[in-house]
A protein has these predicted regions:
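Carboxylate-rich, polar loop motifs that coordinate divalent cations or form catalytic acidic clusters
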Residues: 2-634
């Protein structure tokens, strides 16, 4: 499909929505204000306003594919957002600006909308983020509305109102309202909801949830609709309001409401990811069926697919620009051409990485960075990081660990479907599974030793050497069968498991440690790093604990709050120890000062899943991309 530029009239972009000032709207507006003020005195949510300075981070991202989730027109440009950040396109389809999650924005955007907040005096682009609250952009600068409580920072929806208030949907805390000065819960009926979408206005507000159907607010009254009231599914994906009608999209079709009352189900069985009312029809963006058009006639509507070809992937958003229908997928923007067929008008551009969700990192002797993905195989990046060779097949798809063996100059990929060995040229040479002697085909870690290697699996560990394969599990004294992490030094081997740590000497279990007989706070051992004559042991929920060769455990006094260390996301260098966490970024232990601190600013995600080092540079993989930074700037 040929990529084309797109043009749209400035009048269509800059037209301001007319503001109704009748009695009904005034009454509804006062109801919204009253609902907010009733909770403001005793339920105000503390927050800070931060003025962002994009581009000041010293963390450098490696080009990853853009993924689109939402789009909106603002000040003559089209803005597309997704996990990678916010991209501004001009009317010719050229990129005018990129604001990347991490270096420029504090978190990944999830939704965008335009409006004017009370006190701002000008239209703004509002960006709801996953974990860092609300961003407001006036075309020149960003301000960051950041609640102190992390639960209120995890946003899922944003809806600016004509009154100057901005409604925010959260993942766990329901709906809150920001008026430029205060942040408060919207209404008691909307607290603690898992909000998925917001639509409507002061007089007619619809709130979709993840599992509890849809709530309708009308002039101060609230009504909930679930499956018993006609909704085809309690999981609400999308909502569009048109006059007195509302359409609520679910994975099993669209519920039509008229005057606040359920009327009928449209497009039954269709996964309604996005909705748009246009020219007397309901356009439904689906998961795998492209765009389905449903005529809105009194007779029973018959859905029909839009365009001669189905759009690839999920349709995230539908837009009408200059009377033409546009569909946003995760990797492109399409529109219906004059001939009725879909044409691509924007693409996500070139990228080095095949995916954003990184699970493992390792360097080989040639300085190439092996990058594993959770479900996309692996890339072998050139030392310049400007190109990559992608490998993905039945065995190389879900990468748990990558390890380079200096002695043999081979790289091992521990995957969900075996241990795959590659030669120095990056060619696949051998696949080891249960049929080849492993105790299980799913491999979680691998450690090379002088005479062979040790393979960790959910069923125990397997030793491979010149004598063949032999396995060890709970029957032989292993503290737990499910092994996650390995670390070897001489004849000593540490095996981190779901149930504690086993210490082996000469392949025999010498000691087991759990919360019952050691300083461990959690039994689940996720990562182990050799630091001098000691070991730093990462746990899932208990942070990092020090373990010495005599079997003594000691906690770090400056690591008081518990945290989750991701599986095998630990790295020790001459100067520091790095631990990738689930929510807190990178925990950094300075070996000179013996103190910990955290590194989060500039990361594309606080979920750090893999770490590697080379030439004084640290490489950090996350579930939203890869960055690098000089170790001396840690």
């Amino acid at each position: 499909m040929r990529t084309r530029t797109f043009r749209f009239a400035c009048a269509g972009l800059l037209a301001a929505a007319a503001v109704a000032i009748g009695f009904a709207l005034l009454r509804a507006s006062r109801a919204v204000q009253r609902a907010s003020s009733e909770t403001a005195a005793d339920a105000a949510i503390p927050f800070r306003v931060i003025h962002l300075d994009p581009g000041r981070s010293n963390l450098e991202p490696v080009a990853a594919p853009a993924v689109f989730r939402d789009a909106v027109l603002f000040q003559g440009s089209l803005y597309l957002c997704g996990p990678g950040g916010l991209i501004q396109y001009d009317s010719e389809g050229a990129v005018r600006a990129r604001f990347m999650a991490g270096p420029d924005l504090p978190a990944a955007p999830v939704r965008v909308a335009t409006g004017a907040a009370a006190g701002s005096g000008e239209p703004e682009l509002f960006v709801a983020t996953a974990g860092e609250g609300l961003l407001a952009y006036n075309g020149r600068a960003f301000r960051h509305v950041r609640p102190n409580d992390a639960a209120y920072r995890d946003l899922t929806a944003v809806l600016p109102l004509a009154t100057g208030r901005v409604l925010l949907g959260t993942a766990k805390k329901g709906v809150v309202v920001y008026d430029g000065e205060r942040l408060v819960p919207f209404h008691a009926a909307f607290e603690n909801l898992e909000v998925s979408v917001l639509a409507g206005d002061d007089a007619n507000l619809w709130t979709g949830t993840v599992n509890d159907g849809v709530l309708h607010w009308r002039a101060g009254a609230v009504e909930r609709f679930g499956e018993a009231e006609g909704l085809p599914d309690p999981h609400v994906l999308s909502i569009v309001v048109s006059g007195d009608a509302a359409y609520v999209g679910t994975p099993m079709g669209v519920a039509e409401f008229a005057g606040g009352r359920f009327r009928r189900v449209l497009a039954e069985g269709v996964f309604a990811e996005s909705l748009l009312v246009r020219d007397g029809a309901l356009e439904v963006g689906t998961l795998e069926q492209g765009v389905v058009e449903v005529p809105l006639t009194p007779a029973r509507p018959r859905p029909a697919s839009r365009g001669a070809e189905l759009l690839p992937g999920k349709v995230e958003r539908l837009l009408a620009i200059d009377a033409r229908l546009y569909a946003l997928s995760e990797n492109s923007l399409y529109r219906i051409g004059r001939d009725g067929a879909w044409e691509r008008v924007l693409d996500r551009g070139a990228a080095v990485l095949a995916d954003r969700n990184i699970s493992a990192l390792a360097f080989d002797s040639a300085g190439r960075l092996w990058t594993g993905y959770f479900d996309r195989g692996l890339d072998i990046l050139a030392p310049t990081l400007d190109r990559a060779t992608h490998i993905e097949n039945d065995h190389v798809f879900c990468i748990n660990r990558l390890v380079w063996d200096r002695e043999r100059n081979v790289t091992a990929a521990a995957t969900a479907n075996g241990l795959v060995l590659f030669d120095a040229a990056g060619r696949e040479r051998q696949v080891l599974r249960r049929e080849q002697g492993l105790i299980a085909s799913q491999v979680t870690d691998v450690a090379f030793r002088g005479g062979g290697m040790v393979v960790a699996t959910p069923a125990g560990v397997t030793f491979l050497d010149g004598a063949g394969a032999r396995s060890l599990y709970a029957f032989h004294g292993l503290v737990n069968n499910h092994a996650y992490a390995l670390a070897a030094a001489g004849e000593r081997l540490l095996v981190g498991t779901l149930g504690g740590l086993s210490v082996l000497d000469n392949d025999t279990v010498r000691a087991n440690y759990t919360t019952a007989n050691s300083g461990l706070r959690h039994n689940w051992i996720t990562a182990i790093a050799r630091v001098g004559d000691e070991w730093f042991v990462g746990t899932y929920g208990g942070g990092v604990i020090r373990f010495d060769s005599s079997g003594r455990w000691s906690r770090f006094p400056d690591l008081r709050a518990p945290f989750e260390v991701n599986t095998n996301a630990m790295l020790a260098t001459e100067h520091a120890v790095y631990a990738g966490s689930l929510r807190g970024g990178i925990y950094v232990y300075d070996r000179a000062s013996a103190r910990w601190h955290t590194l989060r600013a500039g990361l594309p995600s606080p979920n750090v899943t893999a770490l590697a080092a080379r030439g004084g540079t640290i490489y950090a993989g996350t579930d939203n991309g890869l960055v690098r930074f000089p170790e001396d700037s840690r």
